[in-house]
């Protein structure tokens, strides 16, 4: 379901509840739904806004399309819970377990998932705008086409995660582990990857313009045909990385290690580099300030 369609469904569900209840009736409705959950019953499309479910064990529960904004789910056990298209805007999920969950199309905007365990979760198409995911475990997670604008994923484990076509503008990945992650066609303009581990990551056709990759490790990473216009790669570890066909206009490469870096088909003519900087790089149809270089063809 598209994000706009999902939001209209959530608003419709909320409006129907409002028309039928008010005041303490809201609290009674939430309390009744919480009791259903704790009794092991499903609660698809339930109204659980503000619910207190700290430490609750909801293994394999059906919470599809639930409206659970600003809920307290700290340390809750939610493994394999169906939360497709659910609305958990602003909820507190610090330390929660959400491993192997189906969270496709979920709305977790502004939620706090500090230290949450979400390995192999399906977050494809999820709304994670401004979410706090620092120190979370998302290894092997599916984040294809997820919206992570302004999200904080600092020191998060995203090893082998799939972020193909994800929206990552101004997201914070500082010191995150993205070893072997897939970010092909991701939109990461202005994102912060400083100190991140991108060893062996796939970033083909990704938009990393104005991104900060200071001191990042992207040994053997694939940046072919990526847009790195104005990006900062100073002090980066780049040995074996592939930048063939990438846009490196205005890139800051100060003190970066370019040994064994594939620069085939790139234009470096506007960068302040000397032949010594490129002596160990792979150059083929590579434009520099001193002419086209073809030593690696």
Identify the meaning behind each predicted range.
Residues 23-297:
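Tandem repeat scaffolds
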């Amino acid at each position: 379901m598209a994000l706009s369609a999902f939001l209209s469904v959530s608003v419709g569900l909320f409006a129907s509840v409002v028309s039928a209840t008010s005041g303490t009736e809201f609290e009674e409705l939430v309390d009744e739904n919480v009791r259903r959950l704790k009794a092991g019953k499903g609660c698809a499309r339930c109204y659980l806004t503000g619910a207190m479910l700290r430490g609750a064990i909801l293994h394999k529960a059906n919470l599809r399309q639930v409206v659970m904004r600003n809920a307290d789910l700290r340390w809750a056990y939610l493994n394999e819970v169906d939360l497709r298209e659910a609305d958990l805007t602003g909820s507190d999920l610090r330390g929660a377990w959400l491993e192997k969950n189906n969270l496709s199309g979920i709305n977790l905007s502004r939620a706090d998932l500090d230290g949450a365990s979400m390995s192999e979760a399906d977050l494809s198409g999820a709304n994670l705008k401004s979410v706090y995911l620092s120190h979370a475990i998302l290894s092997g997670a599916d984040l294809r086409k997820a919206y992570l604008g302004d999200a904080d994923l600092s020191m998060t484990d995203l090893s082998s995660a799939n972020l193909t076509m994800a929206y990552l503008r101004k997201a914070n990945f500082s010191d995150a582990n993205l070893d072997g992650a897939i970010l092909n066609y991701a939109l990461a303009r202005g994102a912060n990857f400083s100190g991140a581990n991108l060893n062996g990551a796939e970033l083909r056709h990704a938009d990393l313009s104005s991104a900060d990759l200071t001191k990042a490790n992207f040994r053997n990473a694939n940046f072919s045909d990526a847009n790195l216009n104005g990006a900062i790669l100073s002090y980066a570890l780049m040995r074996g990385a592939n930048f063939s066909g990438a846009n490196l206009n205005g890139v800051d490469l100060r003190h970066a290690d370019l040994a064994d870096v594939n620069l085939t088909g790139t234009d470096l003519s506007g960068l302040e580099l000397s032949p010594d900087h490129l002596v160990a790089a792979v150059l083929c149809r590579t434009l520099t300030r001193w002419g086209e270089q073809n030593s690696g063809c």
